[in-house]
């Protein structure tokens, strides 16, 4: 049975009713549903094995974004995040996108760089040539360290050698092992290979190896998403669709040329991506580092997305960025909710997960720019933030929605106002 990711009136249900609906829709087991329904999904013994000095666990809201259709397949997207409006915006933009076939995605092979720094070299150019002449020997040695990866079709594929003739510490070489890590994020794999080949590289060059470490600029491991939106889909009561498109294009141009704006623009993209990375137990710091480094690849920090108008006057958005995520290893395997997230997504490869991530990032970027180009970011965001303010003020149950409605109606979304409203409702 194919999944329909549209969830009409889903937000009006209670959390328990939402979970029941998702459980039935996806055919989740009783144990899966219990993981989400009850606190303590991460047992203390597992948490204690993940990091050091554990004294407890920390919970964040776990939601699903609806309406996503990616390469013709409907997907419910688990998102773990504390900020209001992210899930709503992504879901609404996905609803607009699906009217034109949803998101189209693709990705390159899961190739990661392992860097080996070699210092103390008097003739870097000749040392570089010496390494390249013995490339096959180096690759063969690296691949001896992970026979399982080789059996799965992965392994070290190539080496590159970069020379830096003038550094604060004199000339140096940096060799890159190019490793196909298959469905792993790949950090441990490539680090092990880098350490394995270090003695051989020292012998070949006569230099001294210092750092042996992966690079988080995974610019060979790219994922891409594209979306097309018609003017009719973007029109509001106050703005024509054409006017909204022009506003979005101006907003994009701002991010393309101004790093101050680009930083916030790209943060909005990561608002969609990071919650999925967290939900699947992947390393969101690695994804963030790669994203912002990639945004500087031209020598100027700019927008990760591009937006343009096609010959039919439709808005076309594209996001291409590094996406080093995995399905095996680390918290992805140890955290029970990370495993459940992968089952909800229905992904079988790391590349499929990467493509969903960039689709969500593109949707989030569209939502932010649409708001900025029309009503401003605060109107919609603060309406959703009002519920959070109500909870902070002490509202419970039905009080939350009542206080939030009052805050929004009078355009006064502040904690002290929420406290006053709550006292009023309780007759205090």
From Swiss-Prot:
Parts forming coiled coils: none
Keywords noted in UniProt: NAD, Oxidoreductase
Consequence of changing residue 381 to A/N/Q/K: Reduced activity
Catalysed reaction, written as an equation: (R)-mevalonate + 2 NAD(+) + CoA = (3S)-3-hydroxy-3-methylglutaryl-CoA + 2 NADH + 2 H(+)
Pathway membership, UniProt: Metabolic intermediate metabolism; (R)-mevalonate degradation; (S)-3-hydroxy-3-methylglutaryl-CoA from (R)-mevalonate: step 1/1
GO biological process entries: coenzyme A metabolic process
Outcome, altering residue 52 to Q: No loss of activity
Cross-referenced InterPro entries: HMG_CoA_Rdtase, HMG_CoA_Rdtase_bac-typ, HMG_CoA_Rdtase_cat_sf, HMG_CoA_Rdtase_CS, HMG_CoA_Rdtase_NAD(P)-bd_sf, HMG_CoA_Rdtase_sub-bd_dom_sf
Impact after mutating residue 83 to Q: Greatly reduced activity
Taxonomic superkingdom: Bacteria
GO terms for MF: hydroxymethylglutaryl-CoA reductase (NADH) activity; hydroxymethylglutaryl-CoA reductase (NADPH) activity
EC number: 1.1.1.88
Role summary: P.mevalonii can use mevalonate as sole carbon source. With this enzyme mevalonate is deacetylated to HMG-CoA.
Subunit field text: Homotetramer.
Protein name, UniProt field: 3-hydroxy-3-methylglutaryl-coenzyme A reductase
Organism: Pseudomonas mevalonii
């Amino acid at each position: 049975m194919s999944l329909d990711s549209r969830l009409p009136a889903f937000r009006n249900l209670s959390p328990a009713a939402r979970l029941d609906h998702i459980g039935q829709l996806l055919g989740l087991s009783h144990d899966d549903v219990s993981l989400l329904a009850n606190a303590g999904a991460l047992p203390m013994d597992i948490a204690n094995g993940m990091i050091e000095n554990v004294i407890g666990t920390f919970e964040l809201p776990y939601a699903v974004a609806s309406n996503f259709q990616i390469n013709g397949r409907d997907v419910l997207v688990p998102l773990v995040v504390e900020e209001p409006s992210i899930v709503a915006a992504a879901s609404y933009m996905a609803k607009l996108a699906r009217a034109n076939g949803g998101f189209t995605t693709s990705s390159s092979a899961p190739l990661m760089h392992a860097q080996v720094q070699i210092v103390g070299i008097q003739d870097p150019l000749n040392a570089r040539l010496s390494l390249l002449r013995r490339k096959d020997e180096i690759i063969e040695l690296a691949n001896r360290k992970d026979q399982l990866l080789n059996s799965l079709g992965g392994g070290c594929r190539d080496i590159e050698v970069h020379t830096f003739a003038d550094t604060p510490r004199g000339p140096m070489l940096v060799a890159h092992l190019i490793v196909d890590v298959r469905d792993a994020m790949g950090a441990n794999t490539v680090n092990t290979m880098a350490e394995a080949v270090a003695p051989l590289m020292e012998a070949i060059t006569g230099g001294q190896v210092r750092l042996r470490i992966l690079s988080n600029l995974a610019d060979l491991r790219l994922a891409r998403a594209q979306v097309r939106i018609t003017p009719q889909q973007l029109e509001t009561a106050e703005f024509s669709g054409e006017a909204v498109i022009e506003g979005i294009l101006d907003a994009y141009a701002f991010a393309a040329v101004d790093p101050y704006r680009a930083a916030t623009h790209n943060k909005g993209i990561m608002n969609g991506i990071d919650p999925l990375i967290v939900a699947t137990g992947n390393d969101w710091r690695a994804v963030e580092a790669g994203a912002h480094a990639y945004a500087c690849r031209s020598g100027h920090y700019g927008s990760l997305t591009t937006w343009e108008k096609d010959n039919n006057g439709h808005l076309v958005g594209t996001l291409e960025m590094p996406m080093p995520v995995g399905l095996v290893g680390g918290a992805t395997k140890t955290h029970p909710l990370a495993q459940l997230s992968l089952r909800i997504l229905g992904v079988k490869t790391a590349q499929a997960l990467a493509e969903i991530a960039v689709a969500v990032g593109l949707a989030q970027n569209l939502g932010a720019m649409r708001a900025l180009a029309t009503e401003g970011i605060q109107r919609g965001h603060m309406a959703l933030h009002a519920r959070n303010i109500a909870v902070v003020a002490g509202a419970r149950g039905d009080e939350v929605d009542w206080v939030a409605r009052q805050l929004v109606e009078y355009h006064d979304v502040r904690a002290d106002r929420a406290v006053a409203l709550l006292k009023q409702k309780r007759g205090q």
